[in-house]
Amino acid sequence: MTAAVSPARLVLARARTHRPLLAAALLTVLLTTAILATLTAYSTTIGDASLRHALAHPGDPADTTLTLKAEVPADRRAAADTAVREGARAAFDGLPVTLRTLTRSGPYALPGALRPPDRRARGDEPDLTHLAALDPTQIRVTAGRLPARTAGPEIEAALPERAARALGLAPGDRLTLTDRLDGPPAHLRVTGVYRPADPAAPYWRLDELGGRGIVELHFTTYGPLLADPAVFTGDRISTGPSGWLATADFSTVTTDRTDALREAARRGAAALPKADALGGTATATTELPAVLDRVERSLLVSRSTLLIITLQLTLLAGCALLLVARLLSTERAGETRLLLARGASRAQVARLAALEALLLAVPAAACAPLLAGPLTRLLAGQGALARIGLRLDASVASVAGQGTVWLVSAGVALGCALAVTVPALTSSFTAGRAGPLPGAV
């Protein structure tokens, strides 16, 4: 190798000479790198999508929520709301949080005249009820209208559909409730009838009647009677427990955030009841850590399956690449011996082989992450994933923005370059002078 000929020009000249083999090698390297980059992107993307789907559609919708109940006086409810909102945001590791509340009164006795003949309480025990301020998004008015704020002693209220039917009450009726805690009676006027928008919604976990309208235990309890939130700010009715339901927006959660989210949920559920604004009477519950554990185990199984497929493809691609590399080195053996005969050192030959390998590796490393997005979408559009409607964020920008995909592409491309380089080096370094003839010439 003379100084007059630069290594780059020599590499290009050799490439033109062996175009078919180099094209086969380039195609093999590109396919290997693109497929492994796609499997990496697919594993990450399907993991993130599966996690979000599992959190958004759990077996029990209440499992991914944070529920808190506490006895809070009327003058401390605003501070309690702030404390719960901040605590819920911390419990969900900073994710956007939606907070719904249920504020209720103490227990009241219904007038004896309203007892249905088939639902009479034993002895002199009255049927019970209570008032509550409910989240308006969780109810549907079926008759009349929602209660409004009133200035006088009379309180407007709406009854659950089932309770109104059992008690024989309708919009326009009036009744007086007796406070079971020796407080003043509550004078009500029925303005409407409602039912839960979704009786299975987690929100109704805050209601001791579970949104059913009637519960028969030792007492028969009807309710809750829906009242305007302003009713609970004064002393017109007795004070009962308050409930909060916090739900998070999991649309941006990724699998690398699972551990932090699990730990935050555990800490948050333990820390919230100790907040000063809640008076030390609160209880907080969430099943989010258990849900994350189940999802993580499922993801480990799916990733193990992908790992097996990846190893099989790697072995197949490696064999094909070594075969092409051996053919290429065989074709170039004469050129390599000629370079050595003209005074080129083994280091120069090795550098030349490395430059030739980089011609294959660099395009593959650059193109594989860009091809991974469309290939991932192609995989996701087939089979069970397409049938269940699992949506993957597999755009070119999203996949190309994953550092892991670029690292895998670079690593695989360099590995392929090494696989192409080694046969050329070993064949040239082991080639030497022919052995002596067996006899005299």
Predicted regions and their residues:
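Short, glycine/acidic-rich beta->alpha junctions
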Residues: L167-L169, L321, T330-A333, A341, ...
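Feature of multi-pass inner-membrane transport and sensor proteins
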Residues: M1-A24, T45-S50, A54-D60, T330-Q348, ...
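Hydrophobic alpha-helical membrane-associated segments
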Residues: L31-T38, L313-V324, P363, C367, ...
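Membrane transport/envelope proteins' first extracytoplasmic loop
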Residues: M1-A317, Q382
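Selective transmembrane-helix segments that form parts of the transport pathway or gating/packing helices
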Residues: A353-L370, W406-A413
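Membrane-entry segments of alpha-helical transmembrane domains in multi-pass membrane proteins
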Residues: S298-A325, R351-L352, E356, G401-V408
